[in-house]
């Protein structure tokens, strides 16, 4: 929380006075945060898979490949070439939406262990940091043009009491989608951060 307040103070002092230096620092913090979340997502998914029988893994993976993540409704680059062509503001806006889409579902990932209980607060901190970066880079443009009213439906069966098999499937889906989305956000923020370094090679 102290770090968030510090970032807010930096913004209020005017990031425009030193756009490169302040943006680079804010980007470094945001990238570090999403890298931590991505690694955490990978570990949680790996641990969950390890607890399954081989046939359960095969069936759940088969089902997941035929299904969609809730966040797939958020329009994002379809490949690395489109990612590299996207503006910094677009990458930040998509990252913000992806993180925001996990604020509610992430609650079901919490509990049972210290790492799981870190997810929601770390997502909140990351969302705040990305919003600061959007404001610092928007140059008068709308933050979320055309799609500010986008509403995502909850994950399937989220509110229901589920049988053992359905509960297993929902947990697998949530962990797999969380890992997938944190990888996306890490990629988008890393590319956007690289754009601030004219000498850097931002090839994915």
UniProtKB/Swiss-Prot annotation:
Subcellular location: Secreted
Keyword vocabulary terms for this entry: Disulfide bond, Hormone, Metal-binding, Pyrrolidone carboxylic acid, Secreted, Signal, Zinc
Disulfide bonds: 69-177, 194-202
A GO biological process held by the record: animal organ development
Alphabetized GO MF terms: growth hormone activity; growth hormone receptor binding; metal ion binding
Listed InterPro entries: 4_helix_cytokine-like_core, Somatotropin, Somatotropin/Prolactin, Somatotropin_CS
Main location: secreted
Pfam short name (any one): Hormone_1
Chain's role: Growth hormone plays an important role in growth control and is involved in the regulation of several anabolic processes. Implicated as an osmoregulatory substance important for seawater adaptation.
Gene: gh
Signal peptide: 1-17
Residues holding Zn(2+): 36, 186
Name of the protein described by the UniProt record: Somatotropin
Source organism superkingdom: Eukaryota
Family the UniProt entry places it in: Belongs to the somatotropin/prolactin family.
Coiled coil: none
GO cellular component: extracellular space
Residues recorded as bearing Pyrrolidone carboxylic acid in the entry: 18
Species of provenance: Sciaenops ocellatus
